Amino acid sequence: THRQSSAASDVYKRQATPLEKQIIEAMYIFYDKDSISDPDERDRAYLKRMRELNSKYPDDPDIAALYAGSYMSIRRWDYWDKSGNPKGETVEVAQSLEHIIDKGISHPGVFHLHIHLIEASMQPERALLSANSLEETVPIVGHVVHMPSHIYLRVGEYQKAIDNNIRSQKADKQLDKLWGDMPLPNLGTYPLSHKL
């Protein structure tokens, strides 16, 4: 309920750093349906808040990833027109992610979202560094291992795409074995790296 989530966020905010407090406040906008009743308006408010935080903390990889995610959840695979021109805030979001990548920071969220943002562009090679770097960040997660194939396919590196997908299935099976009999959590996406 609204009261419970508000009370929980108050507890965490008392123990949080100033940046963490701002993230909690942004998450409250996004996750608490009672904060703003209209889902589209709530998504726009969350994007606005993450845009502000990204401007304030441009070197923070978590903020960059959350900003990208807030934008991408609104645009939903509609980042480029048929001529390859960016739509909406695509350029700003790409610059935010690429700023973190250029600093040499290894961050699975930044790499993952960069791949998704750039894959349908006319320059998918812009995300090759993300594709080449993502797997090593969380190699036990099949979806993370699979993701580079989105770029490898677009740039004609077909064998690398095949190899990543084979490894992603092995990672899924390894995780499934480690997980045991407990049901996997429903994270609102495909199971593991698309299927076991």
Region annotations inferred by a language model:
Residues 1-8, 12:
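Single conserved hydrophobic/aromatic residue that forms the stacking wall/gate
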Residues 13-14, 50, 57, 97, ...:
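Alpha-helical junction/boundary sensor with strong preference for TPR arrays
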Residues 16-35, 59-80, 104-118, 140-142, ...:
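Amphipathic alpha-helical repeat scaffolds of TPR domains
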Residues 35-51:
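Asp-box/WD-like beta-propeller blade repeats and closely related beta-sheet repeat scaffolds
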Residues 174-190:
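Acidic, Ser/Thr-rich low-complexity linear motifs
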